[in-house]
Regions:
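Transmembrane beta-barrel wall of Gram-negative outer-membrane proteins
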Residues: 1-49, 72-77
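Flexible, solvent-exposed coil segments and beta strand-coil junctions
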Residues: 2-7, 53-63, 116-126
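Intrinsically disordered, low-complexity, charge-biased terminal/linker regions in eukaryotic proteins
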Residues: 30, 48, 55-61, 69
Length: 183
């Protein structure tokens, strides 16, 4: 079912480049451990889409084209640790963590236009540029205190805290033609 009465074809080409890296470094010692994790994900997409056809009602040829280039990146790193501590007869464990991540999406140039009956439709021409950046910072800890009551009983008290800060910025620029009114 084709409500617009358009017959034609759709072409799409896509070039994609991706890079992924993950690293872990840790150290264990008598009273605990420290662990560092880092992740990097990066990709670029270069896409061309073209829709061409003939509108059967008015016998017009139509072409719709979109050219798009997008870069994406995620960088994340964390540092965490566990320390076992002893206070009088209380066994305790401190788990702590620090985290930082940054996400970027950059679309430095996206173009679209529409051709009808061999003529460029000026109001269809659009160029767009956008940049999205998000940064997250986290700091947290958990503390366990365990105390025994006799040979078979014990209790554990746990508390913790998390401080998290997130910031997002978006810049978007869109340029196109608008028809004017003439006096």
């Amino acid at each position: 079912n084709n409500p617009n009465g358009i017959t034609g074809g759709y072409n799409r080409s896509k070039d994609n480049v991706a890079l992924s890296a993950y690293g872990v470094l840790g150290y264990e010692f008598d009273a605990g451990e420290v662990l560092s994790k880092t992740t990097l994900l990066r990709s670029t997409d270069d896409v061309t889409r073209s829709l061409s056809g003939i509108e059967s009602r008015e016998e017009r040829d139509l072409t719709d084209v979109i050219l798009e280039y997008v870069q994406r990146q995620l960088f994340s790193t964390s540092l965490s640790g566990v320390n076992e501590l002893m206070f009088d007869n209380l066994e305790s464990k401190l788990e702590w963590r620090l985290g930082y991540s940054e996400t970027d999406r950059l679309e430095p140039d996206r173009r679209s236009y529409y051709i009808q009956s061999g003529q460029l439709v000026p109001t269809s021409v659009e160029r767009r540029w956008s940049d999205l950046n998000e940064v997250s910072k986290d700091l947290g800890f958990d503390v366990d205190f365990a105390a025994g009551w006799g040979a078979d009983n014990f209790s554990t008290l746990t508390f913790g805290a998390l401080i998290s800060e997130k910031q997002r910025t978006v810049d978007l620029w869109r340029f196109s033609f608008r028809p004017g009114t003439y006096a």
